[in-house]
């Protein structure tokens, strides 16, 4: 068995599919480390990474169009197994001498493929059997183009009535391609296919487990910081909380957690954080009341991106100041996680478009005086939660709904004022309380209130009022890349609305956001 949990690893090249991060998460769930890189990576980087296997993701473009993305030629000469998914299969076929054609018919949604030849990728898996005795698999298709001719050395593994090459393989070189998406749950046996590729074909050992990740992180932290002191911004969110517990276990009293009450937190959150981490877990916490400083810095600013940058920069300024007051503090710890790194890095070709800057990555000033410690930067959110459970953090804290790094700064639309934050805090708390009371909190993936900077006429008793509007939002999602608005019961929505309007003086109207993602994002800013 290998000692380094990163030794056996898979490289995923991203061609732009909305499911690419899902591939990486599925590989990690198997117990194998993987990284996700842009498709236009240099050969030297692949050689240095030395993967046991390479996966080519799906993507929105057409292989038949000039200038569409291609895998580096080295991928097919690296001497390791290669697995092409959807667009990845098409570019593999094209680059190795086959042909891909645009089709007038497209195949989206559920499909049933028939296995026509055996392959290690599909070993001992089937969902049904055809009348002729052939294994059948239920899969999820999402493609327009299709392979018209497979390259020399390949054979057909599976087909559909529409797609003659639903799966292909060159067993000698260990090259595999599927036209469907094994990473999505709609492909019922997809996880087993990925496990066959990673474990059986690539020969990867399952070293990537919560206990081993913790041991590895502790060793790396100790190696990085030595006897130096570390300062961490503790918000009480999942990422910063798990970071705090990891650091506390690794370096103990060398860690000082700075808890900044920026005026953008949820109701009673400051008291809850201090009680849990200070009183219960015994961490060294330095509380800083900085509401006025943040609100002054944000005064007059309406642009969401600029608000995020201001909040991030103000945090760093405070950390710099507090570190200067402490002796020999050289390191700033952050709860940056892997999706932050992926989405902020983009593609080296410059084709990636920043939808929203990430609080942990995009807000760092160039002249920051402290070194960075980011023990979670290799982990997806679901992995962070599992690590937290292993470290002893409570389930209800780790699995509560996501809260953005900038806090209410991106849930108060437009300019941020203390009055708006106070109203929003109370409205949001009522919404969350009623979701718990109605046993709906754990049925939705995320729920929150948004302050709208518009006034609306209302009537309270015989009094006319002209007050602010609150929007409430609840969504259902598996991966947060797509989301459906939650169909909450009318009675629950009515109760939430009545409570907010009656109990939060200054609110005259409550609306329910019924936008999906896409086209809307989950957060309003």
Curated annotation (Swiss-Prot):
Disulfide bonds: none annotated. GO terms for molecular function: ATP binding; GMP synthase activity. Homodimer. This is GMP synthase [glutamine-hydrolyzing]. Residues 208-400 form the GMPS ATP-PPase domain. It comes from the Bacteria. The active site is at residues 86, 181, 183. Signal peptide: none annotated. Pathway: Purine metabolism; GMP biosynthesis; GMP from XMP (L-Gln route): step 1/1. It catalyses: XMP + L-glutamine + ATP + H2O = GMP + L-glutamate + AMP + diphosphate + 2 H(+). Keywords: ATP-binding, Glutamine amidotransferase, GMP biosynthesis, Ligase, Nucleotide-binding, Purine biosynthesis. GO terms for cellular component: cytosol. Residues 9-207 form the Glutamine amidotransferase type-1 domain. It comes from Idiomarina loihiensis (strain ATCC BAA-735 / DSM 15497 / L2-TR). Its EC number is 6.3.5.2. HAMAP family: GMP_synthase (MF_00344).
């Amino acid at each position: 068995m290998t000692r380094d949990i990163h030794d056996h690893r898979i490289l995923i090249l991203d061609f732009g599919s909305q499911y690419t991060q899902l591939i990486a998460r599925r590989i990690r769930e198997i117990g194998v480390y993987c990284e996700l890189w842009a498709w236009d990576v240099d050969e030297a980087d692949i050689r240095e990474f030395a993967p046991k296997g390479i996966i080519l993701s799906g993507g929105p473009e057409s292989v038949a169009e000039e200038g569409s993305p291609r895998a580096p030629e080295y991928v097919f000469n690296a001497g390791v197994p290669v697995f092409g998914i959807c667009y990845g299969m098409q570019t593999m076929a094209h680059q190795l001498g086959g042909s891909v054609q645009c089709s007038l018919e497209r195949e989206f949604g559920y499909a049933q493929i028939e296995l026509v030849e055996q392959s290690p990728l599909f070993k001992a898996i089937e969902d049904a059997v055809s009348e002729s005795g052939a294994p059948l698999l239920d899969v999820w298709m999402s493609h327009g183009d299709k392979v018209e001719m497979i390259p020399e050395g390949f054979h057909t593994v599976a087909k559909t009535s529409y797609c003659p090459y639903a799966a292909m393989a060159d067993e000698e070189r260990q090259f595999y391609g599927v036209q469907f998406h094994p990473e999505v749950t709609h492909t019922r046996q997809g996880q087993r296919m990925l496990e066959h590729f990673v474990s059986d074909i690539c020969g990867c050992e399952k070293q990537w487990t919560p206990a081993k990740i913790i041991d590895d992180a502790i060793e790396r932290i100790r190696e990085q910081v030595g006897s130096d002191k570390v300062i961490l911004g503790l918000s009480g969110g999942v990422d910063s909380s798990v970071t705090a517990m990891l650091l506390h276990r690794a370096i103990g009293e060398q860690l000082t957690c700075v808890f900044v009450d920026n005026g953008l937190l949820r109701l009673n959150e400051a008291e809850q954080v201090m009680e849990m981490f200070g009183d219960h877990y015994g961490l060294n916490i330095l509380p800083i009341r900085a509401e006025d400083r943040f609100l002054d810095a944000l005064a007059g600013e309406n642009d969401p991106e600029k608000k995020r940058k201001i909040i991030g920069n103000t945090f760093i300024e405070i950390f710099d100041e507090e570190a200067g007051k402490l002796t020999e503090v050289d390191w700033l710890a952050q709860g940056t996680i892997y999706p932050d790194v992926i989405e902020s890095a983009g593609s080296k070709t410059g084709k990636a478009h920043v939808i929203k800057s990430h609080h942990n990555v995009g807000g760092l000033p160039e002249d920051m005086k402290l070194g960075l410690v980011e023990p979670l930067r290799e982990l997806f959110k679901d992995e962070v939660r599992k690590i937290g459970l292993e470290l002893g953090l409570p389930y209800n804290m780790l699995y509560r709904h996501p809260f953005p790094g900038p806090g209410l700064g991106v849930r108060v639309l437009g300019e941020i004022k203390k009055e708006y934050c106070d109203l929003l805090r109370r409205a949001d708390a009522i919404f969350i309380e009623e979701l718990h009371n109605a046993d709906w909190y754990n049925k939705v993936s995320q729920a929150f209130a948004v302050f709208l900077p518009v006034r609306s006429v209302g009537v309270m008793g015989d009094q006319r009022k002209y007050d602010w509007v609150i929007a409430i939002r609840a969504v259902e999602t598996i991966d947060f890349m797509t989301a459906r608005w939650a169909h909450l019961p009318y009675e629950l929505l009515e109760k939430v609305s009545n409570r907010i309007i009656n109990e939060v003086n200054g609110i005259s109207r409550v609306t329910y956001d019924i936008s999906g993602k896409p086209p809307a994002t989950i957060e309003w800013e």
